[in-house]
Amino acid sequence: MAKVPDMFEDLKNCYSENEEDSSSIDHLSLNQKSFYHVSYGPLHEGCMDQSVSLSISETSKTSKLTFKESMVVVATNGKVLKKRRLSLSQSITDDDLEAIANDSEEEIIKPRSAPFSFLSNVKYNFMRIIKYEFILNDALNQSIIRANDQYLTAAALHNLDEAVKFDMGAYKSSKDDAKITVILRISKTQLYVTAQDEDQPVLLKEMPEIPKTITGSETNLLFFWETHGTKNYFTSVAHPNLFIATKQDYWVCLAGGPPSITDFQILENQA
C-alpha cells in the first residue's frame, strides 16, 4: 500500500527550519551594536567643561534633561553663547530652562558692535559748545569748503578765509559711553553736518536750533570724535565703521578708509 504523505510532518520541518534561522538572526542582533547605541569612554581632565551626554524624556508639559557635566547653548555657527555648570544627573524643568535663558550672570558672548536697532534706543543729551570757528584740514593740507548749499568739498587754499569754519557741540550718552560724541555746525549758521550712507556726500541740514536731545534716526547728526596726536577722526554714530572723509574730485563723504582721507587737523582761532 502506498504511503500517504504526512502534511503535518512537512509543516513541522518548515517550522524547525524557520526557528533555526530566527535563532541565528537573534544571535546576530545580540552581537551587533544597535544603530542608535551611543557609548562614551572615560572623560579626560581637559574635557571636563564639555557636554558629555544628554538624555531627554517628556512627560506632560515638563521636560526632564539629565546632564553628566554641563550644558552649553550654541549658535548655528557653532560658537558657544552660554555655559552653565550643573551637578551630575540633575533633572531640570521648563522653569529651570527659562531661568537659565534669562540669567544675567551667565557667560554671554557680546557682539563687537551693536546693531542700529539697539543704538536707536540710546539717548544723547546736549551739553555745551566746546569749540568755535575752527577749520578742518585733511592729510593733503586741503581745507573743507562749501561746494554748494548742500555739500562740502576739500581744496588747497592760499587764503584760509575761504575755508568753512565749524563749531563743535558735545553730547552725553544715556548709556554712559566713554567716547566723545559731538555735532558739527557751520559757524554763525544753523547748518549741521549730517551723515548719509557709505560713499554718499554728507549733507548740510538746516535746523531752527541745536538739538537738545537726539535719538533714533537723528543720530546721523552725531559723530564720535577721536584724537591721535594731531590727527582727528569723526566716526558716524549712525554708521560706526564709517568716518567723515575727503576724496579726490568728490564731495566730503562717509568712508571706511583709503583711498579716502579720514584724518583731519583742527586749526583753531582762524577768524
Curated annotation (Swiss-Prot):
The modification Phosphoserine is found at S87. InterPro entries: IL-1_alpha (IPR003295), IL-1_CS (IPR020877), IL-1_fam (IPR000975), IL-1_propep (IPR003502), IL1/FGF (IPR008996). The keyword Transmembrane helix does not apply. GO terms for molecular function: copper ion binding; cytokine activity; interleukin-1 receptor binding. It comes from the Eukaryota. Acetylated within its nuclear localization sequence, which impacts subcellular localization. Proteolytic processed by CAPN1 in a calcium-dependent manner. Cleavage from 31 kDa precursor to 18 kDa biologically active molecules. Keywords: Acetylation, Cytokine, Cytoplasm, Glycoprotein, Inflammatory response, Lipoprotein, Mitogen, Myristate, Nucleus, Phosphoprotein, Pyrogen, Secreted. GO terms for biological process: apoptotic process; cellular response to heat; cellular response to lipopolysaccharide; connective tissue replacement involved in inflammatory response wound healing; cytokine-mediated signaling pathway; ectopic germ cell programmed cell death; extrinsic apoptotic signaling pathway in absence of ligand; fever generation. Changing K82Q: About 50% loss of cytokine secretion after DNA damage. Glycans are attached at N102, N141. Residues 1-112 form a propeptide. The modification N6-acetyllysine is found at K82. It is found in: Nucleus; Cytoplasm; Secreted. Residues 82-86 are annotated as: Nuclear localization signal (NLS). The keyword Phosphoprotein applies. A lipid is attached at K82, K83 (N6-myristoyl lysine). Cytokine constitutively present intracellularly in nearly all resting non-hematopoietic cells that plays an important role in inflammation and bridges the innate and adaptive immune systems. After binding to its receptor IL1R1 together with its accessory protein IL1RAP, forms the high affinity interleukin-1 receptor complex. Signaling involves the recruitment of adapter molecules such as MYD88, IRAK1 or IRAK4. In turn, mediates the activation of NF-kappa-B and the three MAPK pathways p38, p42/p44 and JNK pathways. Monomer. Interacts with TMED10; the interaction mediates the translocation from the cytoplasm into the ERGIC (endoplasmic reticulum-Golgi intermediate compartment) and thereby secretion. Interacts with IL1R1. Interacts with S100A13; this interaction is the first step in the export of IL1A, followed by direct translocation of this complex across the plasma membrane. The similarity among the IL-1 precursors suggests that the amino ends of these proteins serve some as yet undefined function. This is Interleukin-1 alpha.
